[in-house]
Amino acid sequence: MTKITLSPQNFRIQKQETTLLKEKSTEKNSLAKSILAVKNHFIELRSKLSERFISHKNTESSATHFHRGSASEGRAVLTNKVVKDFMLQTLNDIDIRGSASKDPAYASQTREAILSAVYSKNKDQCCNLLISKGINIAPFLQEIGEAAKNAGLPGTTKNDVFTPSGAGANPFITPLISSANSKYPRMFINQHQQASFKIYAEKIIMTEVAPLFNECAMPTPQQFQLILENIANKYIQNTP
């Protein structure tokens, strides 16, 4: 029988291969343990998030107004107050005054946007009335344009009529109305309620931004509103 004798070199190669196999096995075990640890971590995290979500939903439910009656036992009934409280919280989250205190440019843009929105609202209302009466609106536009210019609003002049560059809807109303409409859509089906919520949004926005006008040359939104109303009344009173 032939006896096979391994040379020292072959023995070293086999030993190295065995060592490599053991190292690979150890690496695989370590990797498996790491994957398991990560998996357990995500399971634990998901569980905690679920608990927080359930807790939040319970808190939200407890804050909802309930009406109990024979036809709707235990059914939550939304009220205007619930929607308005949500809109107020949304406005607080936007934090207009906080952002303005940190950024002078933001504060200036906010003041201009608010006064431009006041200008646009009054212009549209009065122009629609004057046009319906067949009255030329050019003199009215010239006068309120001059008032807007005197208020410090930037803009352009065309055909002797100054128009604020930021003329348009109040930019803060849309986020409030949109978020409330998304959360409570059935409360916005009625047009009367839509108008009511818009008026409320304008009111709380004006209250929020009022302090931004305390230390500037611009009139407050209320003062600018009065200036434009006086101009409009002069033309409206002359309508037949």
From Swiss-Prot:
Changing D103A: 4-fold reduction in GEF activity. Residues 78-240 are annotated as: GEF catalytic domain. GO terms for cellular component: extracellular region. Residues 166-169 are annotated as: Core-loop involved in conformational changes in complex with CDC42. Residues 165-172 are annotated as: Catalytic loop involved in contact with CDC42. It comes from the Bacteria. Induction: Transcriptionally activated by InvF in association with SicA. Gene3D superfamilies: SopE-like, GEF domain. GO terms for molecular function: GTPase activator activity; guanyl-nucleotide exchange factor activity. The record marks D103, Q109, D124, I131, T174, Q194, K198 as: Helps stabilization of SopE-CDC42. Keywords: GTPase activation, Guanine-nucleotide releasing factor, Secreted, Virulence. It is found in: Secreted. GO terms for biological process: actin cytoskeleton organization. Changing G168A: 5000-fold reduction in GEF activity. Fails to reduce CYRIB protein levels. Signal peptide: none annotated. The keyword Secreted applies. It holds the Pfam family SecIII_SopE_N. Residues 15-78 are annotated as: Interaction with InvB. Encoded within a prophage region, which is only present in very few Salmonella isolates. SopE-expressing S.typhimurium strains are associated with severe epidemics. Activator for both CDC42 and RAC1 by directly engaging these Rho GTPases and acting as potent guanine nucleotide exchange factor (GEF). This activation results in actin cytoskeleton rearrangements and stimulates membrane ruffling, promoting bacterial entry into non-phagocytic cells. Also activates MAPK8, indicating that it is capable of stimulating signaling pathways that can lead to nuclear responses. Chaperone InvB is required for secretion and translocation of SopE. Belongs to the GEF (guanine exchange factor) SopE family. This is Guanine nucleotide exchange factor SopE. The gene is sopE.
